[in-house]
Regions:
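Structural marker of alpha-solenoid helical repeat scaffolds
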Residues: 14, 48, 82-86
Length: 106
């Protein structure tokens, strides 16, 4: 386990209800390639804040890396709608590209 993960685990232990601490731990797991552990943290964060677009995108990326194509498509579709609702052009383009590639079988 790397120092970044340990630091974020300690922060979450101190502040278990802090969504940013939970997101940071999930992102540390994601960056370490531990997509199952990352997704667990992201799903908890998303339950507390269902409109968190970045978390929704990362859940889709976790699913994709784990070979869960249908789940990734569902996550990216939700993220696309959040990007539209929140007027985020960059993430919208990213989700449209990801969905296009998944629909094309890529």
């Amino acid at each position: 386990m790397n120092d970044t993960i340990l630091r974020h685990q300690r922060m979450l232990e101190k502040f278990p209800e802090n969504e940013l601490a939970r997101f940071s731990l999930g992102k540390a797991w994601f960056d370490a390639g531990e997509h199952v552990k990352a997704k667990e943290q992201f799903e908890i964060a998303l339950r507390k804040k269902p409109d968190w677009m970045v978390v929704q995108i990362l859940i889709g990326k976790c699913d994709l890396s784990l070979g869960h194509r249908e789940a990734a498509m569902a996550a990216f579709t939700r993220a696309r709608q959040l990007a539209i609702d929140q007027h985020h052009d960059g993430p919208l383009a990213e989700m449209e590209q990801a969905l296009g590639e998944l629909n094309a079988g890529g």
